[in-house]
């Protein structure tokens, strides 16, 4: 539908997502009511309960000294959106959650390349979550809201950009699925793009298989193979087109109301005269340098050439040294791409489908529960696995549906990994994003908590970087998890693909007709990532894709090219999996330093007895046995210890309380005196089960004046149950020495 003016100066448009038997979703955009002082502001609604405000602003003056585009995207989660008060000490929102940071990246990735090159004004997009249905996700709605507000801001922006989540449920791709629907899906994909010449150009993809994919596929669901994923990208296009159309109609209506379009100055990285001079003096030497295989040696030689070129052109372009450096980078990009497109050879001499030398090794960190070192060329990743009790799962306080996370994947990228200096400390957005990608790749193959009752922390240390440390992290993590004894459903490997393209003259054409030429690269280097047209990361098992991430600088990639890239990635993935299998092909025995966690069930009405007043009972069991104990609300008890006897002792004590075997007359025990009184001694038979030896029974037929003359607290006595009264009180007698050896048993073991 076209835009409607619902109030003076207030316009709205809607886009309807028709999912057939899965229902429809309505996305509504409104402008002119809120945040009127922003350059562009849009309120986006998903059905009735989900409401976001996106505001885009631009600085008045450009930052001419910047050599990059200063775009900032912030997502503000407001807890009132879900009717909650923040759980922090000050009861207000603090640093952004992981969900918010990942949404910022989802917005930034398709929007950043859509701004004109050379823009140096600071642009800020702030998305505020105002209302959220717990059954929905807000990230994709935020992409559309951010695009719409930017489109309204009068900025040099080639939008609008539409974003949609599609999930494969019962063989159908469903747009804007609910959280419940995603749980029934085998694959979940966020796709963003814009309309170019009547078709949708895909600019960004973030996708993963769901947690239940293996079980669903075994039950007959369609596996997310490469061809299925490619079909999902095509299925997303009509939804994206509808969203882009609605945004454009809103911008057209708001523009007619008199909002001026602003002209922003553009600062090219270099002038044509500078590029001509640099190419004339540096082409031959630079082309030779780009044949050096080693990254460090190649970079050193290019730096030497740059210094020589800057010195040589210093007088001609005084004060324009930055332009000379930028022109040299542009020339480098041109030469790299020419060699790939024309000769099908790459910087390091590989062919377009060749993978760098691979190496895999496990058990490299002595006391770690699991560890591995994975190397692909100069990319080197150390993976380390730590296992702990389920109670160590991460607790999440955000607007997302997830409240705890049992598997945590943390990615670190220290500056020395690229031979540089820099800040170390808290993770940056890039590190959080890479860790999340590796996590999504592995979650589908993790065992359930019933099969493996542990919290798992996986850390990926990027010790060397020259192309796709995130996919290297997937490989290293698979190896480390297997080394830790985690029974993965299947090993997972990942590979980064690239794409280089240009326009060539069609042979025999007389009117200058050109066609697009594409070359897909396997296992891209860092330079190929920077100079190429696509960064395409694919992770999966030998049978299906578990995670996928795509960013492209082109106005769309033909579906057949994308399908070919997926198949090329599968070939590489299978090769890597073979190398990994040589290092480890099944779960190892668990490390002696890892806790042994056992699961038992107790009746819900017995939980209080196991815990005891103020935790007295459970703390006593922990202290006596050295085991860690965690109790869930449903009566599931996790008992963990680094040695089996400690765990078993704790289990026996818990069972004695929660699942007691009532003693009977005639049973014998080796008990501990826990209390003495004037009339006798109380002996502990089982946890929570004591009996009394009357003073008259302590003297073995002789009269004694004081209990302490015979026994004291802590003494061991061999006793027999003589009587149990109606109230359950147990009377004991001492077992004669001649009978004790054959008859008495340990207090933890009852003999009938």
Curated annotation (Swiss-Prot):
Its cofactor is Mg(2+). One of its GO terms (molecular function) is 3'-5'-RNA exonuclease activity. Residues 595-654 form the KH domain. Residues 666-735 form the S1 motif domain. Its main location: cytoplasm. Pfam families: KH_1, PNPase, RNase_PH, S1. Involved in mRNA degradation. Catalyzes the phosphorolysis of single-stranded polyribonucleotides processively in the 3'- to 5'-direction. This is Polyribonucleotide nucleotidyltransferase. It comes from Mycobacterium tuberculosis (strain ATCC 25618 / H37Rv). The lineage of its organism: Bacteria, Bacillati, Actinomycetota, Actinomycetes, Mycobacteriales.
């Amino acid at each position: 539908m076209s835009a409607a003016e619902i109030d003076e100066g207030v316009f709205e448009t809607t886009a309807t997502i028709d999912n057939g038997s899965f229902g429809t979703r309505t996305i509504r955009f409104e402008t002119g009511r809120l945040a009127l002082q922003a350059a562009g502001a849009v309120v986006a609604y998903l059905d009735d309960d989900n409401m976001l405000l996106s505001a885009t602003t631009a600085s008045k003056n450009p930052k001419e000294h910047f050599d990059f585009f200063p775009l900032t995207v912030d997502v503000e989660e407001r807890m009132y959106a879900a009717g909650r008060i923040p759980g922090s000490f000050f009861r207000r929102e603090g640093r952004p959650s992981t969900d918010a940071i990942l949404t910022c990246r989802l917005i930034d990735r398709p929007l950043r390349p859509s701004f004109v090159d050379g823009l140096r004004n600071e642009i800020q997009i702030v998305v505020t979550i105002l209302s959220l249905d717990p059954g929905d996700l807000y990230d994709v709605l935020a992409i559309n809201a951010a695009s719409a507000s930017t489109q309204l801001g009068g900025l040099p922006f080639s939008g609008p950009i539409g974003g949609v989540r599609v999930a494969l449920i019962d063989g159908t791709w469903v747009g804007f699925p609910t959280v419940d629907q995603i749980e029934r899906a085998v694959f979940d994909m966020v796709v963003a793009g814009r309309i170019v010449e009547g078709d949708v150009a895909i600019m960004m993809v973030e996708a993963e298989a769901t947690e239940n994919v293996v079980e669903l596929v075994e039950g007959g669901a369609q596996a997310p193979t490469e061809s299925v994923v490619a079909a999902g990208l095509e299925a997303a296009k009509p939804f994206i087109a509808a969203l882009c159309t609605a945004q454009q109609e809103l911008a057209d209506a708001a523009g007619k109301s008199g909002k001026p379009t602003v002209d922003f100055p553009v600062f090219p990285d270099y002038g044509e005269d500078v590029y001509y001079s640099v190419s004339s003096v540096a082409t031959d030497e630079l082309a030779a340098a780009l044949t050096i295989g080693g990254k460090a040696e190649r970079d050193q030689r290019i730096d030497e050439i740059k210094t020589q070129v800057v010195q040589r052109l210093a007088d001609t372009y005084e004060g324009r040294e930055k332009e000379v450096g930028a022109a040299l980078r542009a020339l480098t990009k041109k030469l790299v791409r020419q060699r790939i497109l024309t000769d099908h050879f790459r910087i390091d001499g590989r062919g377009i489908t060749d993978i760098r030398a691979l190496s895999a090794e496990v058990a490299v960190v002595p006391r770690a529960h699991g560890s591995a070192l994975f190397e692909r060329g100069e990319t080197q990743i150390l993976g380390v696995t730590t296992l702990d009790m389920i109670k160590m799962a991460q607790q999440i306080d955000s607007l997302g549906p997830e409240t705890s996370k049992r598997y945590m994947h943390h990615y670190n990228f220290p500056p020395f990994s690229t031979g540089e200096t820099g800040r170390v400390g808290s993770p940056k957005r890039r590190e959080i994003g890479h860790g999340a990608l590796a996590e999504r790749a592995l979650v589908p193959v993790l065992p359930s908590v019933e099969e493996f009752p542990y919290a798992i922390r996986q850390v990926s240390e990027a010790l060397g970087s020259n192309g796709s440390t995130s996919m290297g992290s997937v490989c290293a993590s698979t190896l480390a998890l297997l080394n830790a004894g985690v029974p993965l459903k299947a090993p997972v490997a990942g590979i980064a693909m690239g794409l280089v393209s240009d326009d060539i003259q069609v042979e025999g054409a007389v009117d200058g007709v050109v066609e697009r030429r594409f070359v897909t690269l396997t296992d891209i280097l860092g330079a190929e990532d920077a100079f190429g047209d696509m960064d395409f990361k694919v992770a999966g098992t030998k049978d299906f894709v578990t995670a996928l991430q795509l960013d492209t600088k082109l106005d769309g990639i033909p579906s057949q090219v994308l399908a070919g890239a997926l198949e090329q990635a599968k070939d590489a993935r299978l090769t890597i999996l073979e190398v990994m299998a040589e290092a480890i092909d099944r779960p190892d025995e668990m490390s002696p330093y890892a806790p042994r966690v056992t699961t038992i069930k107790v009746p819900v009405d017995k939980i209080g007895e196991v815990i005891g007043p103020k935790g007295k009972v459970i703390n006593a069991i922990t202290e006596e046995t050295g085991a860690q104990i965690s109790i869930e609300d449903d009566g599931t008890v996790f008992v963990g210890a680094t040695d089996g006897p400690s765990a078993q002792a704790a289990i026996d004590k818990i069972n004695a309380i929660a699942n007691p075997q009532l003693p009977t007359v005639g049973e014998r025990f080796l008990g501990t005196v826990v209390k003495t009184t004037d009339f006798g001694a109380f002996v502990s038979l089982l946890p929570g089960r004591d009996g009394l030896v009357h003073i008259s029974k302590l003297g073995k037929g002789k009269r004694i004046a004081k209990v302490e003359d015979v026994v004291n607290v802590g003494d061991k006595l061999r006793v027999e149950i003589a009587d149990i009264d109606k109230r359950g009180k147990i009377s004991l007698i001492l077992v004669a020495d001649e009978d004790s050896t054959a008859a008495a048993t340990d207090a933890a073991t009852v003999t009938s």
